[in-house]
Amino acid sequence: MLEILYQDPWLVAVNKPAGWLVHRSWLDRDEKVVVMQTVRDQIGQHVFTAHRLDRPTSGVLLMGLSSEAGRRLAQQFEQHHIRKRYHAIVRGWLMDDAVLDYPLVEERDKIADKFAREDKAPQPAVTQYRGLATVEMAVPTGRYPTTRYGLVELEPKTGRKHQLRRHLAHLRHPIIGDSKHGDLRQNRSAAEHFACRRLMLHASRLELTHPFTGQPLIIQAGLDETWMQALTQFGWRGLLPDNERVEFTAASRQDETHLT
């Protein structure tokens, strides 16, 4: 069962485990574990997506319990009225508190976007980021005798595909576990020495105005075991008090094989 973070007559939010698809895709026809179908079976009613999380990303996923609720939520996301907060573990020491305004060329899928235009101009992409902590571990990576990691808080102000992953790669601080935009040697080292066998990106919090009641709504998602073990090993416990926890549900024991 998935962990339900919030539910009322109009909305439901769950803590999406890493490795789970949000909805079925013809690109992954054999995938049996899908968030939308699992939530539908769990609560006994249909759900309607308003946003998405990449397969390897964990955290808050908010859905409507009717097509109208889904539409209103989607409109808020599209108009950037919903504040999103993520946390990531990255390569190196990133301690800036800054905003990156770096346009991104649309990332196309070789199959799904086979017939899409190839001459589209880069799209505006803005990310606010803040370094929270750093650590240097006595583990060699490549030609270096030690390995450095950073804990970063991220708030995307736009919603481009893989925006956070691509922006951090642009800053030369790729997210650990990112097999597409990251550092493969760092990924292997983190997996071998610190059991970070997934993309270390977590959607920690959504802050919005409820689309039906007009009341402020904050939804937060706890970290899974992989994250908590990393925080412990790096001496970062207590830095994310709203998301840290000790006990875990079965659903939080995510499939660590999906890192793409």
From Swiss-Prot:
The keyword Isomerase applies. The active site is at 54. Its EC number is 5.4.99.26. One of its GO terms (biological process) is tRNA processing. Disulfide bonds: none annotated. InterPro entries: PsdUridine_synth_cat_dom_sf, PsdUridine_synth_RluA-like_CS, PsdUridine_synth_RsuA/RluA, RluA_PseudoU_synthase. CDD domains: PseudoU_synth_TruC. Keywords: Isomerase, tRNA processing. The keyword Transport does not apply. It catalyses: uridine(65) in tRNA = pseudouridine(65) in tRNA. It comes from the Bacteria. It is an enzyme of class 5 (isomerase). Pfam families: PseudoU_synth_2. GO terms for molecular function: pseudouridine synthase activity; RNA binding; tRNA pseudouridine(65) synthase activity. Responsible for synthesis of pseudouridine from uracil-65 in transfer RNAs. PANTHER family: MITOCHONDRIAL RNA PSEUDOURIDINE SYNTHASE, TRNA PSEUDOURIDINE SYNTHASE C. Belongs to the pseudouridine synthase RluA family. This is tRNA pseudouridine synthase C. It comes from Salmonella typhimurium (strain LT2 / SGSC1412 / ATCC 700720).
